[in-house]
Structures are given as C-alpha cells and as structure tokens.
From Swiss-Prot:
Protein name (database record): ATP synthase subunit a
Gene field: atpB
Main localization of the protein described in the UniProt heading: membrane
Subcellular locations according to the entry: Cell inner membrane
Cellular-component GO terms for this entry: plasma membrane; proton-transporting ATP synthase complex
Family listed: Belongs to the ATPase A chain family.
Amino acid sequence: MKDLFLFSSLLDASHTFSYFFHIGLVALIAVIVAMMATRSMQLVPRGMQNLGEAFLEGVLSMGRDTMGSEKGARKYLPLVATLGIIVFFSNIIGIIPGFHSPTASLNLTLSLAIIVFVYYHFEGIRAQGFVKYFAHFMGPIKLLAPLMFPIEIVSHLSRVVSLSFRLFGNIKGDDLFLMVILALVPYIAPLPAYVLLTFMAFLQAFIFMILTYVYLAGATVVEEGH
C-alpha cells in the first residue's frame, strides 16, 4: 500500500494511524447511518428507516433459518447485525479512492473472529452448563473421547482462523486487484471492477453474519439424545 494515496497520510503517514483512522471513520459512518434511520420513526417506513428495517428483517430471517427459532434469532440479532454493519462498511470504504479497508488488516478480522469465538462458547456454557457443554466435545462414544476431544478443540480453534483469514484474504485481494486495475486502465474502464468489489463487500459481510449464527446455534441448541 506504499504507492497508494490515503487521505489519512495527510495527518500521519504511519500504518498504525491509518488503521485506527479508518476504524474510527467506519464507526462514525455506522453511527450516522443508525441515527438517520431512527431519527424520525414512522409507522410506514421511508428512506433510511425503510433500508434499516429491511436489513434487520433480512438478518432476522437468516437467524430464524439457522437457529430454528424466532426467539434465538432475536436474542443474537444485535450482535450479528452490528458485526455485519462493521464488516460491510469496512469492506466498502476501501473501494473509494483515498481510503483503505480496515478489514484488509488482520488486526480487525482476527479481533472480530475472537469476539465471535469467545461469545458463542460463553453462550453455550450458559445455555447447557460447563460440564454438559464440553461433554459434547467428547462425542457419543466414550471409548473415543480421548481422541475426539482434542480434535474438537482444534476444530473450534480453526474457526477463528477461518473467520479471520477468509475475510482478510478476500478484502486484501480486492484492494490489490483494484490497485492494479486503476494503474493499468484508469478512469471509466474500472467501473465493472467497482461493481464486482461492491458485490464482494456484501458477500463477505453476509458470510460473516451467517457463520456467526451457525456457531451460536451449534453452541446453544441442545440436541436430543446427545
């Protein structure tokens, strides 16, 4: 990213400042959008309220399909929707010249993945109890428990790697792709690339949200006979 101009470099050229500058900018944009959507609530939604309600209803529908219940979907809606908003705006801001995607840094993606990892284990223990929750890690066959338990531990730890590196790799790749396109064919020619990158920003936010719901469902939904 050395050859790419960033507005943040006008204040401080360091990578650390750029990272926190864009994180703060994403948070500010999210707050402004939320305020615009809730500023004058109406029975028949219009404008930003309509967009906000459509987004939340979409996330809630995803949660119902994943969790298997309206109650579970609504319980975790604030977390999942907030993660989706942060990931989406962090992705999309990088396609604007002069700005950089915070999700192109492993610092943010790993932090978000750890939040999901810690929270779904916390919810699983709270829903099932400490002993019963970790008993699931040993599998239904007691003789195989010494083998299954470490495999399950590695499997859960790999979710942190999967969540963080998938998002980081895709957005970092998108940034590099855009930089190459702009260098080779500037002006009007990169417009199709912008459409593709906008779609990818939506897609990565969607994947992060649905995986969060999947992990929460796996931790909190008690299976019969297991």
